[in-house]
């Protein structure tokens, strides 16, 4: 992050680091099978892309495309051929970068709502109804006017989920359900 609050340098360094790892992995690709290549990429490349990605959550489309190109390069290494479409990413069981980052925001929002270990000063503000309504049984988060904040991003994404998913207090089940929802959104977007 620069003094102008832009993430260009961070993404540039991240891209350089990931492409360096992929260059090193290409030297051993003839000695590895598909599953090992996939595991190596998930551990050495995708983990770098995922690390603290919710901190710089809404980023410009240009930077998001750079991150997506890194993921395409990683998928190309795994498949052993050129990859530039979302369908190939989904075949690997991965989410594209936009949805992957949204999934991490949703998981953090779930922890903020349901986890007792979440710091009290970082709690997400929920909508409280003055009267008892049928819609008050589902959880909705308050969306602040200030965008580019965790509260705003998490609330916008969390409120768009179906009510049965929002009310799920089991983290593992919530993660699986949101993963399926986001994969379905990717498939619909690709068509």
Role assignments for model-derived ranges:
Residues 1-191:
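Hydrophobic/basic alpha-helical segments
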């Amino acid at each position: 992050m620069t003094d102008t609050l832009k993430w260009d340098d961070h993404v540039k360094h991240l891209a350089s680091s990931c492409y360096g790892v992929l260059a090193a992995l290409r030297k051993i690709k003839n000695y590895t099978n598909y599953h090992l290549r996939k595991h190596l990429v998930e551990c050495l490349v995708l983990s770098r892309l995922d690390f603290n990605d919710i901190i710089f959550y809404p980023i410009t489309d240009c930077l998001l495309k750079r991150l997506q190109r890194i993921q395409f390069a990683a998928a190309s290494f795994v498949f052993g051929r050129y990859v530039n479409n979302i369908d190939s990413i989904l075949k690997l069981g991965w989410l594209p970068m936009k949805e992957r980052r949204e999934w991490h925001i949703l998981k953090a929002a779930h922890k903020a709502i349901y986890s007792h270990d979440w710091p009290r000063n970082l709690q997400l503000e929920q909508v409280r109804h003055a009267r008892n309504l049928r819609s008050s049984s589902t959880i909705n988060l308050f969306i602040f006017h200030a965008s580019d904040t965790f509260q705003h991003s998490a609330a916008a994404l969390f409120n768009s989920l179906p009510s049965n998913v929002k009310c799920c207090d089991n983290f593992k089940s919530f993660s699986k359900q949101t993963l399926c929802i986001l994969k379905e959104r990717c498939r619909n977007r690709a068509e």
